[in-house]
Amino acid sequence: PLPCRRCGRTRAEAIPPEIAAYEQFHDIDRNAWSYDGIQYCVARGLMSGTDTHTFLPGGVTTRAQLVQVLYHLAGDPDMTGVTTPFTDLTSDWYQAAVAWAYKTGVVDGTSPTTFSPSRPVTREQAAVLLMRYAARLPGFAGSDAPADLSAFADGGSVSGWARAGMADAVALGLFGGTQDTGGRVWLRPGESATRAEIAAVLARFGRNVAHLL
């Protein structure tokens, strides 16, 4: 099978809206909290399976995968002839996406010459990339009232460079917290974002921010 442009593994066809994700992927529970987001993303071709019948909702999302999704949101612009300084881009499926994201300022390298395509994306990193992408949309001016991150038990652990992006993302309803048995709500900014979490965030992004998706 051909390598998937979105996940780098095996191409799974984007399913039309009338076909339920749980019918296509054997590891999707239609009663799961993440089902709506997964259905939204696969029906629009924003995300696909890791193989024909597997979505892997609990798997991590890599930098290459998230950049590829944003590239699709941007309409897959032609990046022929556009280069990057990164020497670790070893797979063809994400080359154009990385070039686009780097050129537009949506993403930076992990060093002047490395992109680290296989590195898992953290929740705060995903928030920043989404807000950078949103800043390119006509008329988008961010949140009128960025969220108070101190409301989260771990709000103080959000990296300084990510605080503005995360505060906007929370205010726009893209990210929320997880409540423990003691009633404290955790944002988990440094944890790797799962594929299910990214699907949910992308669905919220499409509905709350990029209304034309």
Ranges and model annotations:
Residues R11-Y35, S48-A96, T104-E124, R132-R163, ...:
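Feature responds to low-complexity, polar/acidic, surface-exposed segments characteristic
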Residues S159-L172, A199:
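Alpha-helical membrane segments in multi-pass integral membrane proteins
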Residues V42, Y102-K103, M166, V170:
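Alpha-helix C-terminal capping/helix-coil junction sites
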